[in-house]
Structure formats: C-alpha cells, structure tokens
C-alpha cells in the first residue's frame, strides 16, 4: 500500500472575535501513516503558563471535538494514540501511529488571565 502525506491544519484559538490571538501554532504539520507527529502551541505566562490547555479536533464537515483536557487528560473514547503535555508557557499534542482519519484541524485553547475585566 502506498503511503501518502496527511495534512494536519493547526488553528490558533481566539477568545472571541474582538480578542487578539494569544496562542501560536505552526500553520500546518504533515506525516505519513504510522508516523508520530507533534503539534506545538506557544503562549505566555498569562495563558498557558497559569492555566490548563485543551486540544480540539475538527474533522471535515463536523463540529470540533474535545481531544485533550487539563493538559494531558483524554475524554472517554479518545484513542491513547493522542497525548498532551505542557511545560512552562508551551504545550504540545502528540499523535502516534498516525492514521488517515487523523487528517483534521487541531486547535489548542487556554484561558488568558489578561482578558479578565
């Protein structure tokens, strides 16, 4: 079977249309089936540095689905191929054993304390 690249589109979470984007992700990542891919998410002390990170997966034509919560917790039904981690003001999502159905948009999200009030 021929291997083919999978494109994982990474979208930065914005807290409302009026808010400045505060988390930074690379525009895309790709890999071939079976590979391990890591997606980074960079923030600051007011968001990732002091709050937990969630990750969402949006498959084409569907609503976003919670993939990882509280930095590294998987909801029931999410395969253990997906794992999350956080260190300082950065977080990452790792997908091991990449599969064709993983081709999707991935969002990182964290509350930003500077948006209060």
From Swiss-Prot:
The modification Pyrrolidone carboxylic acid is found at residue 20. Residues 109-117 are annotated as: Complementarity-determining-3. Transmembrane segments: none annotated. Residues 45-52 are annotated as: Complementarity-determining-1. Pfam families: V-set (PF07686). Residues 24-35 have a biased composition (Polar residues). It comes from the Eukaryota. Residues 24-45 are annotated as: Disordered. Residues 20-44 are annotated as: Framework-1. Residues 53-69 are annotated as: Framework-2. Residues 70-72 are annotated as: Complementarity-determining-2. It is found in: Secreted; Cell membrane. Immunoglobulins are composed of two identical heavy chains and two identical light chains; disulfide-linked. This is Immunoglobulin lambda variable 1-44. It comes from Homo sapiens (Human). The lineage of its organism: Eukaryota, Metazoa, Chordata, Craniata, Vertebrata. The gene is IGLV1-44.
